[in-house]
C-alpha cells in the first residue's frame, strides 16, 4: 500500500542535511505519489529540494541545485552523486551502508 501524504512528508522532514532521497524511496512502487504529496504541500520549511529522481537528476532545476549545493550535497555533472542518498526505511546513507 502506498504511504499517506503525512507519511511521505514526515520522511522528507527526516532526510538529513547534505543527503537526498528519491521519489521511489519515499513511495516504493509509486514514485508519482510522492511527487503529488510534495506538490500539494503548503509547508515552506519542508526540505523538498532533498528529493531527487532515481538517477540523481533534478526535477526543479537550478533552484534545487543551488539549495542542495548550499547543503554541500555532491554532484557529478548535472546529477546528484547518489552516494549522498539516504533511504528513509534504513535511516542510513549509501556510504554508511557500504
Model-identified regions with their sequence ranges:
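Nucleic acid-binding interface residues in structured DNA/RNA-binding domains
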Residues: 1-98
Amino acid at each position: 500500500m502506498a504511504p499517506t501524504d503525512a507519511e511521505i512528508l514526515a520522511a522528507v522532514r527526516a532526510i538529513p542535511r547534505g543527503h537526498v532521497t528519491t521519489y521511489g524511496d519515499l513511495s516504493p512502487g509509486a514514485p508519482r505519489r510522492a511527487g503529488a504529496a510534495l506538490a500539494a504541500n503548503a509547508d515552506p520549511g519542508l526540505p523538498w529540494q532533498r528529493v531527487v529522481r532515481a538517477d540523481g537528476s533534478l526535477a526543479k532545476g537550478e533552484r534545487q541545485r543551488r539549495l542542495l549545493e548550499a547543503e554541500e550535497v555532491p554532484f557529478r555533472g548535472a546529477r546528484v552523486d547518489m552516494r549522498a542518498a539516504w533511504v528513509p526505511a534504513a535511516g542510513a546513507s549509501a556510504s554508511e551502508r557500504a
